[in-house]
Amino acid sequence: MPIAIHQVLATLGYGDAIGHEALGIQRVLRTAGYDSEIFVETADPRLEKCTLDYRELPSASSRDSILIHHFSIGSHASRIAYALPDRMVLVYHNITPPEYFVDVHPLLVQLCYLGRRELGLYRERCDLALGDSEFNRQELEHLGFPETGVLPVVPDFSHLSGPPNYMHAGNFDDDAVNLLFVGRTIPNKRLEDVIRWFYAYKRWFNPRSRLLFVGAQSGFERYMALLNQLVSEIGATDVHFLGHVTNEELVAYYEIADVFLCASEHEGFCVPIVEAFHMGVPVIAFAATAVPATMNGGGVLITEKDPVHVAALIDQIVTDTSLRDRIACSQDSALERLAANDFGATLLGFVERVQRTPRRPHPPVAFDFWDQVKLADQLEEIRMYRPAAYQALPKDCAEGDELTEDAEGAHRR
């Protein structure tokens, strides 16, 4: 009889890369005959039916089981997973270096720093550590994890297969050139560089153009203020911050886009790049961290961020049909190479590898561990149902939960 292979993660989000991967892993495991549930702290209401509460995980735990742990910064679920007897496969989706948040989110600086330290504690706990890109695997190896591998991201584009919703995107569906960025509004994405590229393009090449930013903005209001200040200072017009959108709206924005721009300096994978490939939008991206591997020969990689140079490149792509066709072919080929990765066979191969490997000694857990878990649960209940009492608690009691909430989206998309 197959063993149980469950997953645990802090949040199952709708439409984000980690959520897609967790659901894909579950489909593969269940098809292979394994009992497989997803345990979470929180889930998007549309996905709650796919999950169980993380506090039920201990009752499903067994020495014979395997637990796939999607590492998250400072989550209650992570700490419970650490203490359970199951064999563990850790999946690392990357933690953004804290220096990116120094000027805009001091608390997140602390949390990302602590998160990288916490990750190191799992060296002795997990039987296998997987990155969802070679860049992430190399980080794990650098941290001293003895057994590592790559579980490649094979994006599920089903969320882009529905009919487009042009209710808002229709306002931009005209003869102007639309430059698009999709992703969270967060400093490592370097949206200020994208704004400078657009400003140079609009000023020197095409005044009939606009820049569209699509992606969640919550938690980084200070960074948003800096971006708006930059737009005002340089006199840029037609810059639109559109926030989080539905899948149907996202399809519409991809359909009206002429060029996709990515200036990010730190990515563990960057799913929007391959979404743009899939939607036939030419991509210009800065060659940093995992981005070159994600592009995999598709699109246009740049190694310098000079605005005039990038603006001239945008103009070439927009005006030269032959060049645009060659870029489209390169992106289609990159997608074919990505799709050739057999995600299911790779995952099941890692499961067999863990089963064949002698069990590692379980690291010691503090004698009061479960008392601390119970206390954390009580604090969470107070926060949810008696917020005034929660606010009256000493700062060091309540601060950890606030930090975790702000950080959960910091490395998505």
Regions inferred by a protein language model and the residue ranges of each:
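Short hydrophobic beta-strand element within catalytic cores of glycosyltransferases
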Residues: 273, 282-285
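Donor nucleotide-sugar binding/catalytic pocket of nucleotide-sugar-dependent glycosyltransferases
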Residues: 123-166
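Glycosyltransferase donor-sugar binding loop
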Residues: 41-44, 208-225
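Short alpha-helical donor nucleotide-sugar binding micro-motif in glycosyltransferases
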Residues: 252-257
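Aromatic "clamp/platform" in nucleotide-sugar-dependent glycosyltransferases that forms part
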Residues: 265
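Nucleotide-activated donor-binding/catalytic signature segment of Leloir-type glycosyltransferases, i.e.
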Residues: 224-248
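Conserved donor-binding/catalytic core segment of Leloir-type glycosyltransferases
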Residues: 130, 170-189, 195-198, 212
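Conserved acidic donor-binding segment of nucleotide-sugar-dependent glycosyltransferases
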Residues: 300-307, 316-321
